[in-house]
């Protein structure tokens, strides 16, 4: 009988199974790590441990992986399934020599030398009983629970106290065939493999647990005694005519107001509550791109998460997902408005640090905050902040606030050694709890101050919220970004280290725009967002069920055959399944009559549904604009369509943070897809297949309100070419209100003053707001915008502009 089948081992495994709850990272190793099920597989573990191997054996069957107790049989030879780098640590004395374990590596390499067709996948496996990072001061708790190499007695205590928080992490496989072919099969290579594996396990532990935590007061005193803060305190005392002791006390107050007080114990408790909450709220949380972020952590990058901001849920969702993906929840920059009892202290213990909405003119506060942020970066804590500054009330990305990005870039300029990488994150929901509140705020109602009662009010409304979506976008490594934008930045900073570079502000603006673009590049298309996109483009927000399903199939075809980026995710299924999901979530309603089913958006939530449409409108705006060209111009040519898109794309790019690299190519691909789908034919120009015209009209409707805004702006500029930016914003907003009242436009963003402000900035950048000979361009774009509108809407705009500016 084998050792693991003995009564003693079976009893231990039974007891451990009762005490242990294991979380696997990543959740689907075969899929996420590209493991080949047809190739033999062996596990590499850091330390020989009965409990670790038992925990691994409990999950391998469910994952379709071989049991660690099952020997590796290759060509009649048998080898251990698990290779350990070092033996178990005895209660007393030294660990046994690692020669036995080196021999295990050598035996596997030897088999490859004898069998050229063989390729064993060597999969590193890390186990973590709890994820306590430890404190900078050694404590009894650390002595009992936080050691990397516990004795069997300490391991028993760890299982007893932390067994419900056991994580098993699989890493990308190493091909032993590649190692044997490239480096040979002798003892030297086995030793090298062991060294590389040790470094890997050490880095992996840091990714999973994070750096050790400082004592809060010790951190404060270290910061307050830094040269930068000493100087700021002296300046504060001189400028405010107070003593240095008073200025120092004020700096300590600021630190206490700002700083997080991370508690691993609270995070473990919060994990249980959030697991219950997500299971109550959502049917599932869809994640894309986590493996790339894990790799950046593993490679030693300082990670800064920059998510979009839809809801207060964002704080919880991203931290929860990162925890379950084997990464440490970040320190989160939260608005000081969230520092109310009891949420504030809990957020602070969960890693939140608080920032005032504005601290312009308060030099001491600015210096304290910057030094604290620098300390987080230096010590290796991941950080999260929202570049939009607040939650989007319309579902579109807001114009970025650049303060935190500027501080981050400054940290790099001041000599940050480790690579600093921004990770854009798209957060999406089938239901955002605050949507109704957003609509009231956009209608002029004053925003309520956050309080504990709002939290309880939100908890009362918990229900079926469908799915959540977390997509990690393309990372931006700041050292690489600086090298691309300003190749000689290091030399310039070295010459004048105290001087703020003139190029820093425009570079921060470029970086902010790139962050927002990368967030939108990682958008998640769901049944709710796509269904709202279709129905809100229809006349009465209603369609026959068969027509809606057909239209959804067309959009899915566009999104899957012509993916926006590799970071974008698209819901699985077809039009029928998407409609069914929308009905189950009560986002759309079904009415039946003898002629068939009608699907519609209830009038009471039609405005709220624009929020979900706006989450993904940028993905479909160019196909919609192409459809608009086809429906409004008979026999239009391919080149004419491309020219029209070229005129409007810079405005779309500024408004929707789009990053299409080659619009000409994309337009050509869209037209080819329309031909393949039997929507149009192409001879001298394009002709619409009469029976399919409704599909193109519906698609064109998505960009309709955007074109109306552009028509308002360019009609004003054509009549008043010398109009100032502020006047253009005011007049555009006034005409938009009139147009909305006459034609029933209810989308909140149509009346958003900030949107017209952002467009006017882009118009100035493009040269349309100056006397430099761009009048011809203005006239051309006005004609093109007018030509893509319904005649009634066009006439309203032209007449209103003429009446307002007769002189």
From Swiss-Prot:
SUPFAM superfamilies: Glycerol-3-phosphate (1)-acyltransferase. NCBIfam families: plsB, PRK04974.1. This is Glycerol-3-phosphate acyltransferase. The keyword Lipid metabolism applies. GO terms for biological process: CDP-diacylglycerol biosynthetic process; fatty acid metabolic process. Coiled coil: none annotated. It catalyses: sn-glycerol 3-phosphate + an acyl-CoA = a 1-acyl-sn-glycero-3-phosphate + CoA. It is found in: Cell inner membrane. It is a peripheral membrane protein. It is an enzyme of class 2 (transferase). The lineage of its organism: Bacteria, Pseudomonadati, Pseudomonadota, Gammaproteobacteria, Alteromonadales. Pathway: Phospholipid metabolism; CDP-diacylglycerol biosynthesis; CDP-diacylglycerol from sn-glycerol 3-phosphate: step 1/3. Its EC number is 2.3.1.15. Belongs to the GPAT/DAPAT family.
């Amino acid at each position: 009988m084998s050792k693991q089948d003995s009564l003693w081992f079976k009893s231990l495994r039974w007891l451990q199974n009762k005490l242990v709850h294991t979380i696997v990272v990543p959740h689907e190793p075969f899929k996420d790590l590209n493991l080949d099920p047809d190739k033999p597989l062996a596990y590499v573990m850091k330390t020989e441990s009965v409990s670790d191997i038992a925990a691994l054996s409990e999950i391998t069957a469910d994952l379709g992986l071989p049991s660690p107790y099952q020997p590796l049989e290759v060509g009649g030879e048998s080898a251990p399934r698990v290779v350990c780098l070092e033996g178990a640590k005895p209660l007393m004395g030294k660990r046994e020599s690692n020669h036995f374990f080196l021999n295990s590596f050598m035996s596997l390499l030897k088999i490859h030398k004898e069998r050229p067709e063989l390729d064993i996948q060597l999969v590193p496996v890390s186990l973590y009983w709890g994820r306590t990072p430890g404190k900078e001061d050694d404590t009894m708790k650390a002595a009992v629970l936080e050691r990397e190499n516990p004795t069997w007695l300490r391991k028993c205590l760890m299982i007893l106290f932390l067994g419900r928080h056991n994580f098993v992490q699989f890493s990308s496989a190493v091909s032993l065939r590649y190692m044997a072919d490239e480096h040979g099969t002798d003892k030297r290579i086995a030793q090298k493999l062991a060294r590389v594996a040790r470094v890997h396990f050490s880095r992996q532990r840091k990714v999973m647990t994070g750096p050790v935590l400082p004592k809060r007061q010790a951190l404060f005193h270290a910061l307050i005694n830094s040269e930068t803060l000493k100087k700021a305190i002296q300046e504060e005392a001189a400028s405010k005519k107070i003593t240095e002791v008073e200025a120092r006390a004020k700096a300590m107050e600021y630190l206490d107001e700002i700083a997080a007080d991370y508690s691993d114990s609270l995070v473990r408790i919060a994990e249980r509550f959030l697991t219950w909450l997500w299971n109550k709220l959502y049917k599932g949380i869809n994640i894309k791109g986590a493996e790339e972020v894990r790799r950046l952590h593993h490679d030693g990058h300082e990670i800064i998460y920059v998510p979009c901001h839809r809801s207060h849920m964002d704080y919880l969702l991203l931290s929860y997902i990162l925890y379950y993906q084997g990464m440490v929840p970040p320190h989160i920059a939260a608005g000081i408005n969230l520092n109310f009892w009891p949420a504030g202290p809990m957020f602070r213990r969960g890693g939140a640090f608080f920032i005032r909405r504005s601290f312009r003119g308060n030099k001491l506060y600015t210096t304290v905050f910057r030094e604290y942020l620098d300390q987080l970066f230096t010590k290796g804590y991941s950080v999260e902040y929202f570049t939009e500054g607040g939650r989007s009330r319309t579902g579109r990305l807001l114009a970025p606030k650049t303060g935190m990005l500027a501080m981050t870039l400054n940290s790099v300029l001041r000599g940050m050694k480790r690579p600093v990488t921004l990770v854009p994150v798209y957060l999406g929901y089938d239901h955002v709890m605050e949507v109704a509140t957003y609509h009231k705020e956009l209608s002029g109602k004053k925003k309520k101050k956050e309080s504990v009662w709002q939290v309880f009010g939100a908890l009362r409304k918990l229900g079926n919220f469908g799915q959540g979506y977390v997509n990690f976008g393309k990372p931006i490594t700041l050292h690489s970004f600086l090298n691309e934008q300003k190749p000689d930045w290091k030399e310039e900073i070295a010459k004048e280290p105290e001087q703020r570079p003139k190029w820093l502000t425009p570079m921060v603006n470029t970086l902010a725009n790139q962050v927002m673009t990368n967030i939108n590049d990682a958008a998640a298309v769901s049944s709710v967002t796509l269904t709202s996109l279709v129905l809100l483009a229809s006349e009465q927000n209603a369609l026959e069920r068969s027509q809606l399903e057909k239209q959804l199939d067309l959009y899915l075809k566009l999104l899957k055959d012509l993916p926006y980026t590799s970071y974008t995710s698209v819901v699985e299924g077809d039009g029928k399944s998407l409609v069914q999901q929308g009905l189950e979530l009560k986002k759309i309603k079904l009415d039946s009559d003898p002629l068939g089913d009608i699907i519609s958006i209830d009038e009471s939530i039609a405005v709220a549904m624009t929020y979900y449409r706006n989450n993904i409108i940028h993905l479909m705006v160019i196909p919609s604009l192409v459809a608009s060209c086809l429906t409004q111009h008979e026999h239009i040519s391919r080149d004419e369509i491309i020219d029209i898109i070229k005129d409007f794309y810079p405005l779309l790019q500024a408004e929707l943070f789009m990053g299409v690299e080659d619009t000409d190519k994309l337009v050509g691909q869209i037209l080819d897809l329309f031909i393949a789908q039997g929507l149009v034919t192409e001879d001298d120009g394009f002709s619409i297949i009469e029976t399919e015209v409704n599909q193109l009209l519906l698609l064109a409707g998505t960009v309709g309100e955007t074109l109306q805004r552009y028509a308002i702006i360019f009609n004003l500029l054509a009549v008043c070419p010398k109009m100032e930016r502020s006047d253009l914003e005011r007049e555009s907003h006034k005409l938009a209100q009139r147009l909305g009242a006459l034609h029933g436009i209810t989308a909140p963003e149509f009346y958003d003053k900030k949107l017209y402000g952002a467009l006017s900035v882009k118009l100035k950048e493009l040269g349309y707001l100056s006397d430099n000979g761009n009048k011809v361009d203005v006239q051309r774009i006005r004609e093109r915008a007018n030509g893509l509108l319904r005649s009634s809407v066009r006439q309203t705009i032209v007449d209103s502009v003429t009446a307002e500016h007769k002189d």
